[in-house]
Amino acid sequence: MLTLRSYVGDRWVEGGGTPQTLLNPATEDPLATASSEGVDLAAALDHARARGGPALRALSFAERGAMLGTIAKAIQAHRDELLDLAVANGGNTRSDAKFDVEGAVATLSAYAELGAALGAARYLTDGEGLQLGRSPRFHGQHVGVPRTGVAVHVNAFNFPAWGFAEKAATALLAGMPVVSKPATSSAMVAHRIMQIVVEAKILPEGALSLLVGNARELPALLGAQDVLAFTGSGDTGARLRALPNVIRESVRVNVEADSLNAAVLGPDVEQGSDMYELFLKDVQRDITQKAGQKCTAIRRVVVPAAIAGAVRDDLVELLGAVRVGNPARDDVRMGPLATATQLADARAGVERLAAEGRLAFGSAAPLAAAGVDAGKGYFISPVLVAFEAGAAATAVHDREVFGPVASLLPYSGDAAEAVAIVARGNGGLVSSLYSDDGDWLQDAVFGIAPHHGRIFLGHPKIELSPGPGTVLPQLVHGGPGRAGGGEELGGPRGLAFYMQRVALEGARPVIGKLLGPQPG
């Protein structure tokens, strides 16, 4: 059985004590062990600050971006191996595994291109320079400079490749060294990516470290120049924000947490139309892709009451065609949940929703999955819960069931009512709207906008749209309230978290000489 090791201080270190065992969630067979016991976390952080930070800050954006491009190519060269690991350790179908691994490559490549566009500069100018007085020589310019600490990334179990890449790409391009902590249950993919990067000798010493096993006191060791980016539950995010050192040192923290994402069908959309079929396709995909274990997955399906029955029947038909089982089989469309804990949480969540609504498809009951021994694996069927009144429901607006579970909520067709229902989620990463009615869209978009980081406007004429569940590196990822209040990616916007914005005030020629030529 494989032993995963941490990569800290530019060497591989095996943890001691009693390790955690990583399983195949479809068969429950043990695959690997991981432990962080005995790893000197303070020394790992100091090494990143002392060696990785100065080396990265000495490079231009173009040079940093070139390294990201090389990492993307290295991962792509090992694509099939990584897909196999994602199937075995993550319970992903091959299609789901591609969604993760190819998403990592695409994000790294996007930030490599951004680095090339930013060119020879090492600092990021923020807006145009300002004349501060009667004389044009009295000048001001806002500038982003890399922070001199270390970026600690605590990633979720559901996207071990993309989660690693999307955080590391922005930090490294900004000029900050990274210590990446993958979720232990699915860490084999991130561990192998780290091996690939180390073997290829792409990055300067100290620029990238990996900690496997328990994070232990890692967040408690951060100081004023460090940053912490966390993806996971809202409860854990709140505990991290409340750490004494985080409060005392004003450690910069980004949290991407729970989200009750909604998909709203406009009153103008007729059953059988192209828009209607797109809506069904997006909802069905978000319920079943990665067994619903996506932070961006549609959880609340809000439809006009007049066609709620038809939508329910059509979704039931689509979900009934989904074969659940061992994702190593070609005929399986949906694999298991990642861990026994996730399965228990999902079952409890389904039971809570079903206590208020009605199970239209699936249940929390044990499932006979294809290609696995009876009683093995962390499987649950796709679940659709139908509610009689969208606005009156409570649990559906309060509890995210992190699995292949969605709730169907009727509304009158009025945009204001749809906005009120969606807003009950108390902040989300993304919600989607499907309508050709411009007036309805105007009210709906700007009604739900304050509650979201992204709004997806579904339309059948958008070719190759990946749907609302896909996070694109060019657009921000995050959201207010329940979603954590954070923001990642968004092209150059993603660099701001890792940089200090400083206002330079003085003689224009002096400031111009300090900054040098800037990208146009």
What function would you assign to each model-found segment?
Residues 28, 64, 86, 175, ...:
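Residue-level signal for inorganic ion chemistry
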Residues 26-33, 202-205, 224-227, 306, ...:
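Conserved C-terminal structural/oligomerization subdomain of aldehyde/semialdehyde dehydrogenase
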Residues 199-201, 225-227, 235-392, 414-420, ...:
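ALDH superfamily catalytic-core signature
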Residues 25, 41, 61, 272-276, ...:
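Residues at or immediately preceding the N-termini of alpha-helices
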Residues 120-278, 309, 412, 486:
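Rossmann-like NAD(P) dinucleotide-binding subdomain of oxidoreductase/dehydrogenase enzymes
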Residues 108, 190-193, 221, 240, ...:
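Hydrophobic packing residues within well-ordered alpha-helices of enzyme cores
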Residues 1-136, 321, 338, 347:
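N-terminal Rossmann-like NAD(P)+-binding subdomain of aldehyde/semialdehyde dehydrogenases
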Residues 30-37, 53-57, 132, 152-153, ...:
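Short, well-ordered beta-strand elements within core beta-sheets of diverse protein domains
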